[in-house]
Amino acid sequence: MSDQSSFQPLNILFGSACNLKCGYCLQQDGTPKVNKKADLNDFILKFWDYLDRTNKKFSSVHYWGGEPMLYWKRIKEVYKLIAPFVGAKRHRITTNGTLITKEYVDFCNNYSDIFTVVSFHDGRITDDKWRLIGKLNHFSIEALIHHKRVSPLMLRDDYERICDLMGKRPPIGFDMIKANDGCHSDYWMTEEDLCDYFASMVLIYELANIKKDPFCQAVIAQFLYRYRKDLKYKGIKPNPCVNNHILSIDLFGNTYNCHHNNSPENITGNIFNPDFIPPKPISFNLSRFSSTTDCRNCKTYPSCGGGCYTSNTHEIDCFYYKTREELAKLWLEELEKHERETSRIRQDLQRP
């Protein structure tokens, strides 16, 4: 295994079971090793020993399915037993929202370090569930941009309806799908799709600044936040997801290249057994994009890191990241200029 001395985020994979079957899901078909029933007490004892041996601390812990609500009892137990020891400021659960219960909401609201990300999957969440989700103290909504939904504006009316149901305006963000083998090609983005997407983002930016539209302001805020976040870390490592700064494990201690694929072919080792040899050879070329001369010489590399190593549409991804950076830099410059001018005017008004 690689040196783990600089791990920061921790991904824990509980299984791949899900109550939905979305065509754009990144999990690939097969019978993942992660789905075997693990002994929680055994996992906790071995994980505590791992922390003691390595003196590891993690900046964040992410709990993954499948659909995490199908594993909620196990997730809750693991959280309670590891949270005091891992040093994480945030524990994040990403769910499709359809199975959230009052017990889940009440539990999360008792712990300020638990953050819930609710994935919007084409209106499958009922109004009653949205009202319940709205009672969470810490959550956001995320949706995907894909071939069948090329503009955030296509969800604007849904978002406003959800806000009315909740009586609040949660943060909302949009990510482009990753066109790996798990995602059906019907959802893969084309260059024309991206042109339409960025045209809509320009319109959203204008509506956010001129009309002060709250939905558009939220979309732009997340767009810029994600760009700045990517800029901080993607270009300094060999792959955006696979590196010595992220640990992805299942309840047996198996380590994975990334949390988006928990198939046996993606197992790289085991934190409980350093001598463990993966049962199947790794079938992914982790650096097929990120280590190429074209990627490393590209001015966009610091914010994309070469893109996803599982992508089947690398050229489209490249076009996305380059255009995103062009717009983000322009909008950030305008924002900084506005802040400087506003600060200057305030100072002038304070002078005698």
Regions found by a protein language model. Give the residues of each.
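Exposed loop/turn and edge beta-strand positions of beta-sandwich/beta-sheet ligand-binding modules
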Residues: Q8, K57-S59, N243, D294
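A C-terminal junction/extension of Radical SAM enzymes
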Residues: P171, N180-P264, S303, P352
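Canonical Radical SAM [4Fe-4S] cluster-binding loop centered on the CxxxCxxC motif
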Residues: S2-D42
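Flexible loop/turn segments at secondary-structure boundaries
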Residues: L20, M69-L70, I100-T101, K148-V150, ...
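Cysteine-centered iron-sulfur cluster-binding motifs in ferredoxin-type domains/subunits
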Residues: F14-K21, E67, C295-P302
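Flexible mid-to-C-terminal extensions adjoining Fe-S/redox cofactors in radical SAM and related proteins
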Residues: N254, H260-P352
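Residues that scaffold the ATP/ADP-binding catalytic core of kinase and kinase-like folds
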Residues: C25, E103, G307
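Radical SAM/AdoMet-radical enzyme domain recognition
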Residues: N11, L40-W64, Y71-E192
